[in-house]
Every structure is written in structure tokens, then in C-alpha cells.
Amino acid sequence: MVMLDTLANAMAAIVNAEMRAKPEVIIMPASKLIANVLRVMQREGYIGEFEYIDDGRWGKIRVRLLGRINKAGVIKPRFSVKYKDLIRMPDWLRKYLPSRDIGILIISTSQGVMSHREAIQRRIGGVLLAYVY
């Protein structure tokens, strides 16, 4: 089976497990990008602990769920946003989050993967990867 977008598959697995009220989910294959996105989600309080499991192939990630995710997904195409766009939240960016203060956008910047709030504090832009609320 060919996996074209591992981040989209990981986000779909998390949302499906949350909808079924599962206590944990196993994401495979693992990647550094998925681990960095999970780290941001953990810092923001959407998921619990996660651990890498080496299976000798691609690896897996076990994620403990807290039941706080209503919706999550990737943003396709992954387009760039400037710092000023993050502050103003134009209509095309507002469609991913239900409200200004609810949810996070996950952004890949030159300083690493972070939430849009952290990018605003650091005054940097980047490439939109995903949204969670």
C-alpha cells in the first residue's frame, strides 16, 4: 500500500480514534514531521504522552488520547503565511478554525514546527501544515 501523505494519515487516525473514544492510537509509519506535530499538540494540551516504537521497518508512534480533539486535519496545499497574515487572520485562514481563540494552526517555520500563537510571539511566518480544535 502506497502512503502518499503520512501526516494526513496520522491526523485521520487520531480523529477516528477520538470519535470512537479510544484511549490510545498507533500511528504508522512514523516520521520526524509527525513527531514534531504531535509535540506541538501535546504542548497545547490536545494529546497526552506519545512514544516511538521501533519495529525494524518504518517505526510506529503510540499516542495517548485525552478526548479533547473535535476536529483535526492537514492543510492542502501547504501554502506560506507571513507574520502579518497570522495577526490579521484573513478569511482564507479563518476557515480552518471555528473562532479566533479556539484551536491552533500548526506551522513549519525556520525555527521548527510550532503553533500559530507561538509563531506570532516570535514574529515569524512559515508554511501551514495542519489545524486542530
Curated annotation (Swiss-Prot):
The keyword rRNA-binding applies. SUPFAM superfamilies: Ribosomal protein S8 (SSF56047). One of its GO terms (biological process) is translation. Signal peptide: none annotated. One of its GO terms (molecular function) is structural constituent of ribosome. Keywords: Ribonucleoprotein, Ribosomal protein, RNA-binding, rRNA-binding. Pfam families: Ribosomal_S8 (PF00410). InterPro entries: Ribosomal_uS8 (IPR000630), Ribosomal_uS8_CS (IPR047863), Ribosomal_uS8_sf (IPR035987). GO terms for cellular component: ribonucleoprotein complex; ribosome. Belongs to the universal ribosomal protein uS8 family. One of the primary rRNA binding proteins, it binds directly to 16S rRNA central domain where it helps coordinate assembly of the platform of the 30S subunit. HAMAP family: Ribosomal_uS8_A (MF_01302_A). Part of the 30S ribosomal subunit. This is Small ribosomal subunit protein uS8. It comes from Hyperthermus butylicus (strain DSM 5456 / JCM 9403 / PLM1-5). The gene is rps8.
